[in-house]
Amino acid sequence: MNALELEQILNHKLNSQAISDYAPNGLQVEGKKDIKKIITGVTASQALIEYAVSQNADAILVHHGYFWKSENPCIRGMKGKRIKTLLVNDINLYGYHLPLDVHPELGNNARLAALLEIEDLQPLEQGTVSIPVYGTLKTPLTSDAFAARIEQVLKRKPLVCSDNAPHLIRTVGICTGGGQSYIDLAANQGVDAFISGEVSEQTIHSAREQGIHFFAAGHHATERYGIKALGEWLSQHYDLEVEFKDIDNPA
């Protein structure tokens, strides 16, 4: 498949042009024109790039790519090494950030919800696109039982704050990655619990004072599943070899 054709397919599937983001979505570093093998992963780290090189991949597809609005634009140091490795090996880099968070089928929120048996997802924000969502547990659970399910699914123990929250969790707000600031929106909606990847100092106060369960399950851990699902979708619909590589990150 042609590299630019792949970008068009991904842009269309994720409706990337409709979402305002703080990183470019699409082909970020151009390599060879013909793509047969793709490595997917959460972040375009040096370790992921070197793995792609070892597998003779033609492209890398990630959730966390490069060229964020707040980052130094100079191509030097760590970023210079990463980009040089891509260019020397003629590997394309595709990155999709918010479009992959919010996609109703393949998105990080949607995939995590499915794994945790949270159904009937609804937007928490007003407007055409909502980054956080909320839904209903298939079976109501205690905080301990829900934490155990998170640990079983994500293979990591979540940080839990359940002070002053209801005994049973029926409704859950979700925003994977660094979405902890949406806890107030979830509390205003009246949901019983909120799960994100990260936690801030003020998040715990928000949870305690508003009587909502809070679970922080890891930025990386909560965002494995969107990019994995996107790669699986590509391999099912196109003549492409796609492999998900998990470069573990405890954060």
UniProtKB/Swiss-Prot annotation:
Cystine pairings recorded for this chain: none
Keyword Metal-binding: yes
Gene Ontology CC entries for this record: cytoplasm
Protein's UniProt keywords contain Metal-binding: yes
Keyword annotations: Metal-binding
Gene Ontology terms, MF aspect: metal ion binding
Amino acids binding a divalent metal cation 2: H64, H219, E223
A Pfam family recorded for this sequence: DUF34_NIF3
Residues bound to a divalent metal cation 1: H63, D101, E223
Gene3D superfamilies in the cross-refs: NIF3 (NGG1p interacting factor 3)-like (3.40.1390.30)
Domain of life assignment: Bacteria
Oligomeric and partner information: Homohexamer.
Record-linked PANTHER family: GTP CYCLOHYDROLASE 1 TYPE 2 HOMOLOG (PTHR13799:SF14), NGG1 INTERACTING FACTOR 3 (PTHR13799)
Family to which the UniProt record says this protein belongs: Belongs to the GTP cyclohydrolase I type 2/NIF3 family.
Name of protein: GTP cyclohydrolase 1 type 2 homolog
Organism in which the protein naturally occurs: Pasteurella multocida (strain Pm70)
